[in-house]
């Protein structure tokens, strides 16, 4: 896990939600990177969120898919400057999850504001917590956003769609010569 992926912002948002006595759990899945496990767990202790936050380390393939299947919402508060087009968001919408993320790189191409999820201000735990709380308290809307995200994935982001777009681009280049 990397600090620039918004880990500490999400932990702070979880602390805000815990103080409001909201019932939720937040699961972190990802390789330990510039954040040591000890530091991560000391933040959890500092915020008093042991009961609602868990970390599982790196998971791949079907092991990672289990976590998407168990989730009702995906949160990605990144401010990583090389975020380009995060595959993890495509994986989340493919599984029918509403997403909350930041306006970094190609994220606005994946998340349609208010339709497939929400785009929030970077490093703002209060706004992030508000959006998470809103979707937890509105599960039907959260589910509809997830369905809209899955539809968008099938319309724009499958391997077949990618291959067809690439083929069209290459044909256009050949025609231009």
Stretch-by-stretch model annotation:
Residues 25-39, 58:
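Glycosyltransferase donor-sugar binding loop
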Residues 38-59:
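Nucleotide-activated donor-binding/catalytic signature segment of Leloir-type glycosyltransferases, i.e.
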Residues 58-59, 66-71:
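Short alpha-helical donor nucleotide-sugar binding micro-motif in glycosyltransferases
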Residues 127, 134, 141-156, 162-165:
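A short, well-ordered alpha-helix in the C-terminal region of glycosyltransferases
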